[in-house]
Design a protein with these regions (language model features):
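Polybasic, lysine-rich low-complexity intrinsically disordered segments
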Residues: 2-7
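Short, Lys/Arg-enriched N-terminal segments with co-localized hydrophobic residues
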Residues: 16-30
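The feature marks the mature, well-folded catalytic cores of soluble enzymes
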Residues: 30-334
Length: 334
């Protein structure tokens, strides 16, 4: 009888500890995604990888206007400068307690711009359908996706084109950049189509989705924008950075002014858009990472809006068509 009781107690303990181990194992594996907006305190982010990007592209191999401009003018960045700039960005994120993940390395592949590979809305991760030139990048994120509950990953049909740089999450709003031009298929810089927006409406019926038609140009960086976050971005709790001439229809620009209020909108000039002023990155509502050369913007953020600015140099990476927001894929914010 005593042996039986001991055996039962032992079996009970085994079952109990098995449950504990299973709980700890599942807690570790399942990442609880949470992105309600662009500026809440950042907890976990994927930061792109600067190493092994391969040789500079030929002019015909570029797929955005800034890269085309850089190759044409023989100023395309070299790897050591890219590594230096991304390391500085990573140091700022770590300084503020952010957990940082990276894509797995792919030799000879540009993996700097994590933003476009996937993006999170609330507790769902939407896997992007990248342009063909960038499809290989997605394979490097499998180890990240494996930590997410499969039912929280949305895989869109291949004909639904979308990239994370075109999607801005703002509480009840989703702002989505797109291209409605008849020449959509001819633009390498047209990354998000109408079909993808219609599917977002089905997956997120509670959101007010605002589609914004963007100007596109594959070769002249002053005459078009690659993604929405190159001409519009959100900071603080109710403010934005905006470039009027990035929108095909001025009514889209006016709508954004109406939503945020004109005094809450920092207006960007043509040259500032070229330098990528809108593409800063928020760690918190009162904390933004910006390029040190954005003097007018950084002063405005600090003096007018009370937002602390962490300044780093990102000049070389800017020549490749992206900046700070483009380099990140936020997974968890408070």
């Amino acid at each position: 009888m005593k042996k039986q009781r001991k055996s039962q107690r032992f079996s009970g303990r085994v079952v109990y500890f098995r449950h504990i181990l299973l709980f700890l194992y599942s807690s570790k594996l399942i990442m609880k995604l949470n992105i309600q907006n662009e500026t809440a305190r950042l907890k976990t982010v994927v930061l792109g990888r600067p190493e092994s990007i391969g040789a500079a592209p030929m002019l015909a191999e570029t797929y955005d206007a800034k890269s085309y401009h850089a190759v044409e003018n023989n100023i395309y960045p070299v790897e050591k400068d890219i590594i230096r700039e991304m390391n500085a960005f990573e140091a700022v994120l770590k300084k503020h307690g952010v957990e940082i993940l990276h894509p797995a390395p792919i030799e000879g592949c540009n993996q700097i711009f994590a933003r476009d590979v996937a993006f999170v809305i609330e507790d769902k991760l939407v896997a992007s359908n990248l342009i063909q030139d960038r499809e290989a990048e997605q394979d490097a994120y499998h180890h990240v996706f494996e930590e997410i509950k499969w039912s929280n990953i949305i895989n869109l049909p291949k004909t639904a084109h979308i990239e994370g740089g075109d999607v801005l999450v703002w509480n009840d709003f989703l702002f989505v950049g797109t291209c409605y031009s008849e020449d959509y298929r001819n633009f390498k810089t047209a990354r998000t189509n109408k079909y993808a927006i219609e599917l977002l409406k089905e997956y997120f019926p509670q959101k007010r989705i605002i589609d914004l038609n963007l100007k596109k140009n594959d070769r002249e960086p002053y005459r078009g924008v690659l993604h929405l976050d190159c001409c519009f971005n959100l900071v603080g709790r109710d403010k934005c950075i905006i470039y009027k001439n990035g929108f095909v229809d001025e009514r889209d620009y006016r709508l954004l002014l109406d939503i945020f209020g004109e005094t809450n909108c920092f207006q960007v000039t043509d040259q500032e858009m070229f330098e990528m002023f809108p593409n800063v990155f928020s760690i918190a509502p009162d904390l933004v990472v910006s390029d040190e050369v954005f003097t007018r913007l950084n002063r405005h953020l600090t003096e007018e809006w009370g937002i602390k600015v962490e300044e780093i140099s990102y000049r070389e990476i800017s020549k490749m068509g992206g900046l700070l927001r483009c380099s990140t894929m936020p997974l968890i914010r408070e």
